[in-house]
């Protein structure tokens, strides 16, 4: 009888401790700068048989709470076919599963395309391609008309949440 009583008390104590334990933190995103940025920066990106240069000034590296990186960069497609220029705006390298807007993206390297609406104030489409050029995912972007100084590529982090901006168009990164 004592064994059963002590087992019940022990089970209750474990249940109380588990209930009081803090919940797992949401994925906190931070921007990477300095030497860590330089180490993660990729000079050329391979897509559809081409090594396309990236733009360092238009590159963002984010780091999650798990220490895994997400690298976003615009591509310099001048000198490439009009098909490549129209299809790809940038690239993404992810070291873990991530949500880019509503699109789930697995670990790997991808090309990014942006299809802007007419008129320009509406939501655009961000398209994710594998390195062979096949469409992997698509998500809608938001348009931020109030953005004071839009730049070609930037990321903001507020309260651990990240937004990726391509000009005035943005998606949340998780």
Sequence positions of predicted segments:
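Positively charged n-region of N-terminal signal peptides that target proteins for export
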Residues: 1-4
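Conserved short hydrophobic patches within well-ordered secondary structure
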Residues: 7, 109-112, 164
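Bacterial N-terminal signal peptides
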Residues: 8-21
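Compositionally biased, intrinsically disordered low-complexity regions
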Residues: 10, 66-69, 92
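Amphipathic, positively biased hydrophobic alpha-helical segments used for protein targeting
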Residues: 19-22, 113, 144
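Primarily secretory-pathway and cell-envelope proteins
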Residues: 26-83, 131-174
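Mid-length scaffold segments of soluble, non-membrane domains
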Residues: 77-130
């Amino acid at each position: 009888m004592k064994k059963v009583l002590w087992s019940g008390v022990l089970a209750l104590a474990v249940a109380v401790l588990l209930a009081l334990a803090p919940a797992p933190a949401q994925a906190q995103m931070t921007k990477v700068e300095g030497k860590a940025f330089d180490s993660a920066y990729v000079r050329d990106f391979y897509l559809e048989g081409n090594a396309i240069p990236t733009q360092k000034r238009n590159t963002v590296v984010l780091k999650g709470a798990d220490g895994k990186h997400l690298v976003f960069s615009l591509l310099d497609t001048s000198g490439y076919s009009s098909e490549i220029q129209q299809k790809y705006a940038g690239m993404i390298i992810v070291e873990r599963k991530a949500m880019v807007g509503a699109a789930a993206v697995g670990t790997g390297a991808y090309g990014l395309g942006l299809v802007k609406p007419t008129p320009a104030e509406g939501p655009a489409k961000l398209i994710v391609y594998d390195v062979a050029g096949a469409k992997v995912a698509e998500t809608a972007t938001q348009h931020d008309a109030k953005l004071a100084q839009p730049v070609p590529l930037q990321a903001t982090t507020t309260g651990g949440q990240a937004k990726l901006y391509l000009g005035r168009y943005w998606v949340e990164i998780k």
